[in-house]
A protein has these predicted regions:
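Catalytic nucleophile loop of clan PA
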Residues: 40, 162-185
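Residues that form or immediately flank small-molecule/cofactor binding pockets and catalytic motifs
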Residues: 153, 164, 188
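Protease-domain processing segments flanking chymotrypsin-fold serine proteases, especially trypsin-like
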Residues: 1-43
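Charged/polar, solvent-exposed surface patches and flexible loops
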Residues: 17-21, 150, 199, 205
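Serine endopeptidase catalytic core focused on the charge-relay Asp
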Residues: 23-24, 28-36, 43, 51-158, ...
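C-terminal cap/linker of serine protease catalytic domains
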Residues: 180-207
Length: 207
């Protein structure tokens, strides 16, 4: 069977209609006023988070007490207090950083949600159509359409979809329902959806 037979038909137009409201879920991340990467806002169990790559924000920013700012599409600079360590989660092995957002009133935008099929086997996502919202060349937000063509036993996604270095930390979204299935990390993606209990790889949320 040809690969194309696996790709689900989708109404691209309906997806484009909601892109405008989703744009504010993507942010540039600045550390000490220097742009270093991309992140996105997501909602898990009614809690709001900033998710990005471990290669963009890691433990050293806590130790060095650096100032982290977010720049969203309406050009509003939002400061986030990251001094509460219990609300920051790192996973170096899978390259993920998650920061719980307390000041929800400061960020009035669209929070992305995790895909509904979090308990299905990883093979479920093979050949699924995806798109990636990203800041290309550190300028405007672009959307790239593609598909997943491989998932290895480390939950690394190999996809056919245009990205560059500035895409690291961007969300990988299921084209069918516009929900998160992964995050861009270097030259590959990380699948956030597991068949185990937690949708986040190796990360437990603290109540």
């Amino acid at each position: 069977m040809d690969r194309k037979d696996y790709i689900e038909p989708i109404n691209i137009l309906s997806t484009k209609k909601i892109l405008e409201q989703m744009i504010n879920s993507i942010c540039k991340i600045e550390v000490n006023n220097e742009k270093i990467g991309t992140g996105y806002f997501c909602k898990v169990n009614s809690m709001n988070f900033l998710m990005t790559s471990y290669y963009i924000i890691d433990e050293k920013y806590l130790k060095e007490n650096k100032e982290i700012n977010l720049l969203i599409n309406n050009n509003k600079n939002i400061k986030i207090d990251i001094e509460i360590q219990r609300e920051i989660y790192f996973n170096k092995e899978y390259g993920i950083t998650i920061i719980e957002l307390k000041d929800e009133d400061k960020i009035k935008n669209y929070y992305l949600e995790l895909d509904d099929n979090i308990y299905k086997d990883n093979e479920y996502y093979k050949y699924k159509s995806i798109y990636i919202l990203q800041y290309l060349n550190d300028k405007e937000i672009y959307v790239s359409y593609g598909y997943i063509n491989e998932i290895n036993n480390k939950n690394e996604i190999k996809y056919i979809c245009y990205t560059d270095n500035s895409s690291i930390g961007s969300p990988i979204l299921n084209l069918k329902n516009n929900k998160i299935i992964g995050i861009v990390n270097n030259n590959y993606g990380i699948l956030l959806i597991l068949s185990s209990v937690s949708p986040f790889i190796g990360i437990s949320f603290i109540a």
